[in-house]
Amino acid sequence: MPRTAGIMNFPDFRGFTRGLILWNVGVYFLLLLLGVVAAPLAHSILNFAALVPAFFLHGYLWQVITYCFIHTGILGTALEMLTLWFLGSFLESHHGPRWLAELFFTSVIGAGLAAVALGLFARGDGYALFAITGCFGGIFGLLVAFGVLYGDLEFMLFPFPMTMKAKYLVIVYMLISLAMLFSSNRIYAFAELGGALVGYLYIKAAPRRGYAFAMSEGYFGLRNGYYRWKRRRAAKKFEVYMRKQNRDVYFDKEGRYTGSEKDPNDRKWMN
């Protein structure tokens, strides 16, 4: 896809992006309310939904997705939602909601598995019991997609009066995450880089309309191929039977009946 140039403004608030943001904000305020009126319940939900590598390895497999809906700080949540609005709506307007949903959740899962891997191989640092929250993994996948597909697009860096191309912004974020690998928050940095890598692999390897569309097309292709095979098989059996009756019948290569006087390449008369 060609790179585009221009100054990026905030896109529309709609579609899958709007639904995703509303879910995140709704869950955040629900947990905030429960923390006041039913703190034990809020704590139980956090243990159930936040990604804890040790819990994941003991069967809490859903946490590799649910952690992206759990947020614990108002400032971090606001920044993530603004970034998700900016990147998600823009990409959704160009590629559709299905493609965006696949990219986002694939990146979320990739980031979660990266965090689990670090927790597994760095048990001595206590990361196996570290609770991971936030949709940063999906955002990093969107960020990489934005930088790769629209690298020359420029936008204002609020609140600074300057513009930056998307590809340079992606490089800056990747360098920050690499630097954070040497800090106490390295599990978040490792997860961010995992989400970015999986997002990059998705936009390079996934079909143009996404995996769901490709799987649907593949299923119907296999089903139709099976029906054609059955029709050809039945046609051959019928030809053998009619020859035993000293009669000739004609079928095309797809098993459709044709008359002896018809042109087999003329499909208008086929039954």
Predicted feature descriptions by range:
Residues 82-86, 154-156, 171-180:
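Hydrophobic, membrane-inserted alpha-helices
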Residues 2, 33-34, 147-153, 201-207:
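Structural signal for the C-terminal ends of transmembrane alpha-helices
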Residues 105-107, 160-165, 169-174, 195:
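Central hydrophobic cores of alpha-helical transmembrane segments
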Residues 128-151, 166:
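Membrane-interface micro-motifs in multi-pass membrane enzymes
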Residues 93, 149-162, 208-212:
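Alpha-helical transmembrane bundle and helix-membrane interface signal
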Residues 61-69, 91, 157-161, 214-222:
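Hydrophobic alpha-helical segments of integral membrane proteins
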Residues 1-15, 25, 176-271:
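C-terminal transmembrane module of polytopic alpha-helical membrane proteins
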Residues 11-132, 181-194, 203-204:
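N-terminal TM1-TM2 helical hairpin plus the immediately adjacent luminal interfacial "cap"
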